[in-house]
UniProtKB/Swiss-Prot annotation:
CDD domains named in the record: Cis_IPPS
Name the UniProt record assigns to this protein: Isoprenyl transferase
Enzyme Commission identifier(s): 2.5.1.-
GO cellular component, one term: cytosol
EC primary class: transferase
Family: Belongs to the UPP synthase family.
Domain of life: Bacteria
Sequence positions that bind substrate: 19-23, 31, 35, 63-65, 67, 69, 186, 192-194
Organism annotation: Geobacter sulfurreducens (strain ATCC 51573 / DSM 12127 / PCA)
Active site: 18, 66
Amino acid sequence: MHGLIPDKLPRHLAIIMDGNGRWAQERMLTRIIGHQKGVETVRIIVEECSRLGIGYLTLFAFSAENWLRPKTEVKALMALLKKYIASEAARMDANNIRFNVIGNRDELPPDVNKAVQGAIDRTSGNTGMILTLALSYGARQEIMTAATRIASDIASGVLKADDLSETAFASYLFTSGLPDPDFLIRTSGEMRISNFLLWQLAYTEFYFSSVNWPEFTPEELYRALSDYQARERRFGRTSAQINTRS
């Protein structure tokens, strides 16, 4: 038993899945084997989050900066991504999971984009957890894209500068329609957010696990969620104010 309190689970959980290469290196295996093992962990954690009743799960799968990795590794990652999405679409559909992608999809290979769109279309009517993969994603690029679109809309009269608010700005981001993450987990012991959801993480609780992603089990997930449930989220208020409101 995990001992978690259902009513205190994060509505939106985000995970930076780090440590595939490190896990492989420790075992004298190739990096791609580490990524393959990481995909198995994705499958397990996605289904566990859905079972727990978490409404939104966002996974940082491939950053805008990851294109700078060796071409052989990038090619292998794209092939693995295509295979995962194509093979998991039916499983997601059966589990009532809705699939979503954020990032610059135009930079993805056509066959990967085809698999992505197929999974999005197949699961579009589902009402359970929304699984979002961040692919070719960078938060600074996201913010710049939003700012450019806003400037264009103001110039064309679609938007008035005086009407620009935080809510209006957020509607121009890739994550439009998604709530901000309540909880962010990063694996492998690294303590940084690596250009991930810079706007959206303003009041998110962070948790850094020393476990590499391929070894991130449901038990490790429960440990992280238990830590989250023990925290007091204040959103700039005092403890007294929070207790009075509750």
